[in-house]
Amino acid sequence: MISLSHFLVLGGVLFAIAVLGIFLNRKNVIVLLMAIELMLLAVNMNFIAFSHYLGDVHGQVFVFFILTVAAAESAIGLAILVLLFRNLRTINVDDLDQLKG
């Protein structure tokens, strides 16, 4: 049987991979967005695991709120990314330091 510690270790490993993805690759916006989504996935796994093992539904309801925020974040982030690529022809974070008003 899979215990709570297995789920928590898996969530911790996913979160650590996401943090490494952010720190090791600060150039590409798409990789940064994917790492943030992986962080949210790790947090959701921990909420689901605690909710299941405690017999409480509040953690599962909270996961639905996190999923809606993550979907909105992804949609807005990718829309901004498409506009930046159309205007600047790059998605490199270092090239996105120009302010135009």
Curated annotation (Swiss-Prot):
Key words of the record: Cell inner membrane, Cell membrane, Membrane, NAD, Quinone, Translocase, Transmembrane, Transmembrane helix, Transport, Ubiquinone
Keyword NAD belongs to the record: yes
InterPro entries found in the cross-reference section: NADH_UbQ_OxRdtase_chain4L/K (IPR001133), NUOK/Mnh_C1-like (IPR039428)
GO biological process per UniProt: ATP synthesis coupled electron transport
Subcellular location per the Swiss-Prot or TrEMBL entry: Cell inner membrane
TM region(s), chain numbering: 4-24, 30-50, 61-81
Catalytic activity, as annotated: a quinone + NADH + 5 H(+)(in) = a quinol + NAD(+) + 4 H(+)(out)
MF-aspect GO terms: NADH:ubiquinone reductase (non-electrogenic) activity; quinone binding
Origin: domain of life: Bacteria
Pfam family, one: Oxidored_q2
PANTHER family: NADH DEHYDROGENASE SUBUNIT 4L-RELATED, NADH-UBIQUINONE OXIDOREDUCTASE SUBUNIT ND4L
Record's function text: NDH-1 shuttles electrons from NADH, via FMN and iron-sulfur (Fe-S) centers, to quinones in the respiratory chain. The immediate electron acceptor for the enzyme in this species is believed to be ubiquinone. Couples the redox reaction to proton translocation (for every two electrons transferred, four hydrogen ions are translocated across the cytoplasmic membrane), and thus conserves the redox energy in a proton gradient.
Protein name per Swiss-Prot or TrEMBL: NADH-quinone oxidoreductase subunit K
Organism: Thiobacillus denitrificans (strain ATCC 25259 / T1)
Gene: nuoK
